[in-house]
């Protein structure tokens, strides 16, 4: 009854108006799963391949008809008749069909769309919510949200080089309360920006993209003001997280790495100077998480950064690890970072995503389930976060429907779980001093 009878791929548009892949999988019992694939703006060079058409006369070369065709031909033919309950086997078949180390032939966007749609169809066939199907009876932890309320870098035309300034409602007692706290701070930040005569336009992930702020510290000072205006205490109720996305402004010069802050006066920092700068920031502001603080190939720098502040701060590898167990294994062996960002389309299949989360936890690393800057109404990552009891999710501000779709799904899951739902707040940082 759970055999696959149809696989349908199509081209839809994401939150930036760029084409992306959507897939329907239909089972013999009539159950249907649908999944849409996100896309990043600041992408790591080690990510799985997002197959684009490169036809400049159509969507500026960003069409995905090649990937859609791969879904509707090769992948469909390989999966028809397979049992949707055999997720690992289905993903294995697609990886073997692709025959490349980075999914460059069929496209990670094609493979992931099918992988997620299969899981959703299987869950529907069994009459289970997706998080319960993926994680089992112990799936009960609602994640601490990292709410990106101020955008910079590649995500916005603002005056800061760091890409994301996030707040974490660590003092909340439930996910619902966390959402309220985050929304209130976000709205107060908007009022402050408006009063300062600055822009309240938002970036790709729904955070404000002001043009008049004075660099990184100016952004942190504004957010601190907004937290206080909302009636919350810095460090106790709300903590900060940064996504530097350093690979976007990192240059290798004579075997060493330099970081060029073009939007902040043209400052250039070495790896050691970056580490010192981060130390100064965490001593001044309640920053408990720094993502991609150094370039994706600056392994020695990552080890230094982790030794310097890894006992006090979550050091998250995004471009460094790209949700890839081989790169994560290297990081664990070297002592680079203490946390991994989980982006499903970086690796391109559900099975490999779950493997990365499991490897991280076994090594004492935390895992942060994440959206991409180009999103859709698909809320799968909300279910993945609860299924794996990951403890943290990063999915934008309380603005833009493509971001709110994930938060609203988590609110529904919390309601469904009822009294067994857990929200652990500050305790999700189990590998640092709190």
Curated annotation (Swiss-Prot):
Binding site for Mg(2+): 243, 291, 318
Enzyme class: lyase
Cofactor annotation: Mg(2+)
Keywords: Cytoplasm, Glycolysis, Lyase, Magnesium, Metal-binding, Secreted
One GO-annotated biological process of the protein: glycolytic process
Gene from which this protein is expressed: eno
Chief site of localization: cytoplasm
Pathway: Carbohydrate degradation; glycolysis; pyruvate from D-glyceraldehyde 3-phosphate: step 4/5
Active site per UniProt: 205 (proton donor), 343 (proton acceptor)
Disulphide connectivity of cysteines: none
Name of the protein described by the UniProt record: Enolase
InterPro entries with a match to the protein in the record: Enolase, Enolase-like_C_sf, Enolase-like_N, Enolase_C, Enolase_CS, Enolase_N
Family: Belongs to the enolase family.
Pfam family, one: Enolase_C
